[in-house]
């Protein structure tokens, strides 16, 4: 077997397992939401209280994600990834055993810690292990895995809860996660991705590790902050549409629930196809900022069309599908731009920091969009989403990555 074939197989295995880990994290995130009506009745709480659980999880995840990145750079991505899978699995298992709402709230803290590790660990592994010419495909597979996790979770939780109750569904998800963690622990393809390659090279040369001041200077540099801003606005736009587009289209267009739900489904499936197309574009383009800006600008224009309230009902699903396609197609190029803003030895902390912008946007967006719907402004569900998309365009077009010499791929020259 030739060296190139061996490398391709190794890259494919790494990409596959990291994509599967991302699928698992999104699967975990959406296990509970379909069960809320059952949990609400059993514990005698309202949806606001259950929503607080979700906010607690994402707040803890956002705060912990940057710290998880530091741990990844220090101790290695594989160990941290395993910790996250086990922690999130235990949180779901304990949810099935909870006897009060306050226990659920405490368990949400553990779930947030578990959720925080996936992005910094995943991207540290991909950047360290995969040939740079395949990173577009790697990041695309990573994004597709996450979307499929969201699609599978409701089927899993509703299917098991219908037959055996909601507790059985969460316990089954937790046990499944622990079994998967045991399998991931045996995957040697991930084992030499730790610690961060840049940090290791520095140690090998006898160079001291960067101090806290240098770490903060890295995280607060212009390129990294613009990546953080992109992720925050991106999350506010897309989480707003995912969460409130059904309510927005029913209020603005008088659309039947089945039509509005079909439009959301189109958005999600368009996103999956968009990530695939975006991976191909990222693999064949060096102008990643233009790829990302174009996708978000087209998505914003289509979303403004929805905000007009002038579209016929039959077109809603098609327009939402196109919005999903163009906005999600930016993900692989977006992740390569983060790589370009990352100095050697800082992969985990930078990806952890910028991806915490997703959690920040996910925490703020429901409050804003819900407020607009409560005040009978459904057009602004789409108008605000479009404005946030345009903000991402501004972030990415003004982004100036580090010099090429500073972002040379952290892999042997033969790769």
Walk through the language-model features, giving the residues of each.
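Juxtamembrane intracellular "pre-TM" segments in multi-pass secondary transporters
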Residues: 2-9, 194-226
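Extracytoplasmic gate region of multi-pass secondary transporters
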Residues: 32-33, 223-268, 272
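Conserved MFS/SLC helix-loop-helix module at the cytosolic interface between two early adjacent transmembrane helices
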Residues: 63-99
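Helix-to-loop junctions at the C-terminal end of transmembrane segments
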Residues: 64-76, 275-287, 373-374
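Cytoplasmic membrane-interface "Motif A"-like loop-to-helix N-cap segments
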Residues: 74-85, 283-296
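Cytoplasmic helix-loop-helix junction between adjacent transmembrane helices
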Residues: 107-146
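Helix-loop-helix hairpin linking two adjacent transmembrane segments in secondary transporters
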Residues: 142-190
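C-terminal transmembrane helical hairpin of 12-TM major facilitator-type secondary transporters
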Residues: 288-334
């Amino acid at each position: 077997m030739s060296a190139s074939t061996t490398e391709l197989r190794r890259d494919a295995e790494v990409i596959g397992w990291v994509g599967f880990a991302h699928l698992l994290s999104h699967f975990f995130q959406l296990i509970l939401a379909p069960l809320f009506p059952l949990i609400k009745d059993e514990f005698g709480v309202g949806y606001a209280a259950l929503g607080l659980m979700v906010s607690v999880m994402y707040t803890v995840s956002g705060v912990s994600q940057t710290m998880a990145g530091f741990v990844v750079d220090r101790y290695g991505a594989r160990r941290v990834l395993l910790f996250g899978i086990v922690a999130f699995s235990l949180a779901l298992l304990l949810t099935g055993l909870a006897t009060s709402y306050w226990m659920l709230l405490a368990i949400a803290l553990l779930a947030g810690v578990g959720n925080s590790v996936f992005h910094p660990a995943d991207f540290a592994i991909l950047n360290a292990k995969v040939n740079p010419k395949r990173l577009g495909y790697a990041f695309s597979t990573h994004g597709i895995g996450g979307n499929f996790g969201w699609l599978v979770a409701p089927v899993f939780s509703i299917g098991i809860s219908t037959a055996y109750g909601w507790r059985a569904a969460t316990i089954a998800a937790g046990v499944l996660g622990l079994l998967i963690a045991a399998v991931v622990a045996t995957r040697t393809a991930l084992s030499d991705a730790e610690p961060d390659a840049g940090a290791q090279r520095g140690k090998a040369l006898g160079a001291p590790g960067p101090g806290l001041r240098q770490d903060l200077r890295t995280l607060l540099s212009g390129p990294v902050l613009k990546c953080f801003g992109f992720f925050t606005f991106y999350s506010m736009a897309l989480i707003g549409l995912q969460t409130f587009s059904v309510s927005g289209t029913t209020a603005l267009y008088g659309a039947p629930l089945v039509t509005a739900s079909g439009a959301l489904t189109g958005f999600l499936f368009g996103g999956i196809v968009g990530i695939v197309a975006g991976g191909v574009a990222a693999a064949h383009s060096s102008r990643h900022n233009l790829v990302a800006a174009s996708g978000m600008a087209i998505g914003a224009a289509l979303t403004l069309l929805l905000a007009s309230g002038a579209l016929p009902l039959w077109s809603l699903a098609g327009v939402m599908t196109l919005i999903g396609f163009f906005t999600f197609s930016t993900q692989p190029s977006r992740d390569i731009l983060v790589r370009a803003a990352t100095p050697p030895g800082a992969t985990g902390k930078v990806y952890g920091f910028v991806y915490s912008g997703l959690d920040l946007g996910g925490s703020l967006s429901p409050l804003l969009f819900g407020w607009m719907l409560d005040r009978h402004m459904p057009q602004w569900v789409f108008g605000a989403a479009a404005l946030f998309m345009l903000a991402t365009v501004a972030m990415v077009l003004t982004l100036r990555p580090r010099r090429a010499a500073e972002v040379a791929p952290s892999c042997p020259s033969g790769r």
